[in-house]
């Protein structure tokens, strides 16, 4: 299948999805977690890849995935139905502000759009997937705070500036950094992304570095260990 990306336990069809599988998404799917997670929510699921990775990693969890784009939601639903853990996955076509579940989640994840107030992408659907405005992060945090259990964790991946914006806004809701993974392309390059975990614990944050490449075309052992349960190449 031309638009398919095969993982060890499932396959992702990317047909009709404005945002295709990328390093940000698979890293978040491999890193985000909470001990004994029972109810998981993926906000802005796209192809469904993060939700599927979490369903694989947490075999006793129920995973809900919300997607605002109708075509992407249809594709994610197809991918979920074709997965071996389809019985624990549910994809919903909804904006996050309209999603009102009757339960709390102990693990929420999001790989959100991040070009805040930038030039909008000329293709509307890619614009929705990649760009946002100043109010988006506020709406996201408001909904996360309303849906997250008191001992739950919210994980996201963003460039540094946008990650700091969310961290600053999260204080209003009593959420603070628990874990920060600083991502570099290699050990000689500056940080390009942060995976951040927010929770209500008030404990000091744990900081770690991840380097993707050890040399030209060579992945680091740490990167391969993170993704060895998913990527066929590892």
UniProtKB/Swiss-Prot annotation:
User: Which Gene Ontology cellular component terms are annotated?
Assistant: cytoplasm
**Do you know which InterPro entries this protein is assigned to?**
DNA_methylase_N6_adenine_CS, SAM-dependent_MTases_sf, Small_mtfrase_dom, tRNA_Adenine-N(6)_MTase, tRNA_adenine-N6_MeTrfase
Matching SUPFAM superfamilies, A to Z?
A: S-adenosyl-L-methionine-dependent methyltransferases
Catalytic activity reads: adenosine(37) in tRNA1(Val) + S-adenosyl-L-methionine = N(6)-methyladenosine(37) in tRNA1(Val) + S-adenosyl-L-homocysteine + H(+)
Q: Which Gene3D superfamilies match?
A: Vaccinia Virus protein VP39
**Listed Pfam families:** MTS (PF05175)
One of the entry's Gene Ontology molecular-function terms is:
nucleic acid binding
Q: Which GO terms describe its biological process?
A: methylation; tRNA processing
Instruction: State the EC number(s).
Output: 2.1.1.223
UniProt feature coiled coil, ranges: none
Q: Where in the cell is it found?
A: Cytoplasm
Which superkingdom?
A: Bacteria
Keywords from the named record? Cytoplasm, Methyltransferase, S-adenosyl-L-methionine, Transferase, tRNA processing
Q: Detail the disulphide connectivity of this chain as listed in its UniProt entry.
A: none
What functional role does this protein have? Specifically methylates the adenine in position 37 of tRNA(1)(Val) (anticodon cmo5UAC).
Q: Which family does it belong to?
A: Belongs to the methyltransferase superfamily. tRNA (adenine-N(6)-)-methyltransferase family.
Q: Which HAMAP family match?
A: tRNA_methyltr_YfiC (MF_01872)
Q: What is this protein called?
A: tRNA1(Val) (adenine(37)-N6)-methyltransferase
Q: Which organism is it from?
A: Pedobacter heparinus (strain ATCC 13125 / DSM 2366 / CIP 104194 / JCM 7457 / NBRC 12017 / NCIMB 9290 / NRRL B-14731 / HIM 762-3)
